[in-house]
């Protein structure tokens, strides 16, 4: 293990234990133990002009042992801190799912989690309070399955040492699988001109089969729906370190616009990591509501939940630009949505021969 990683792990352990020590000091001073966190809501995110990302605002909520509910949350925090510190001492790691089940073995029933969403949220809370990423706690999610295909040579750390991989020549049709912690990757060289993030596996496979990555020197990143943190981190590194334009290609519905938003602006629940995960320069290719009209794409009508989501996005500060106001307004007017693969109504090659080249040229990428 490198010195850098040892230093990161030491800092992670120290910051975790500092949380428990804070509770102890509050007890010793005769104070009720408490922990303050930023309010994680749409109304408490603000634009950081220096970093060009959306971050939490000044609104805070306090978790206090003054109530039974608050005391339980602090108890769970202490048990989780103890587990994570021990995990770091032993040089081991675990998944978020395993943490949920591991709590079943804790000797205090009140410290056990009711479901995984509760333990996941607590890990996020500990990230915020400690200022340390969960990857440095040695916590990882389940495999996202997201993959990369394109003219990129990299070096990754494995249990058997470092190995070099070319993300076209050394992989099958599936591509190179993004590791849980992409900061363990070193970029060696690339012939790529841009990055294309693709929402669906079906469209990603179409682009690869049609040779889009070869023909246009593109690094195709499969987002796999709502992108995992590792996928967003790798995308940001491709932009920041290799100076590659990043584009995002999704379905044409409000949920897919949020997928783009998580890549470009960051998500509300991980706004504390926006500078680490978000790529504010990322551009949205489509499917745009304007594309639905221009290409007369096969569509489905908007559901009530779609309409509510679109109206919510109009109030979301991350989508309050002229482009999004116009496109969302148009979608509400036409009352339609379309999938990426609806482009196949014009032939299997239309997306790679016509749609993407034309849109990328319009955006100044090609």
From Swiss-Prot:
GO molecular function terms attached to this record: ATP binding; DNA binding; DNA topoisomerase type II (double strand cut, ATP-hydrolyzing) activity; magnesium ion binding
GO terms under cellular component: chromosome
Record text on subunit structure and interactions: Homodimer. Heterotetramer of two Top6A and two Top6B chains.
The protein's name in its UniProt record: Type 2 DNA topoisomerase 6 subunit A
Annotated residues for binding of Mg(2+): 199, 251
InterPro entries named among the record's database cross-references: Spo11/TopoVI_A, Spo11/TopoVI_A_N, Spo11/TopoVI_A_sf, Topo_VI_alpha, TopoVI_A, TOPRIM_Topo6A/Spo11, WH-like_DNA-bd_sf
Originating species: Halobacterium salinarum (strain ATCC 700922 / JCM 11081 / NRC-1)
Function in brief: Relaxes both positive and negative superturns and exhibits a strong decatenase activity.
A Pfam family the protein falls into: TOP6A-Spo11_Toprim
Reaction equation(s) it catalyzes: ATP-dependent breakage, passage and rejoining of double-stranded DNA
Swiss-Prot/TrEMBL cofactor(s): Mg(2+)
PROSITE patterns, per database record: TOPO_IIB
Gene: top6A
GO biological process per UniProt: DNA topological change
Keywords: ATP-binding, DNA-binding, Isomerase, Magnesium, Metal-binding, Nucleotide-binding, Topoisomerase
Intrachain disulfide bonds: none
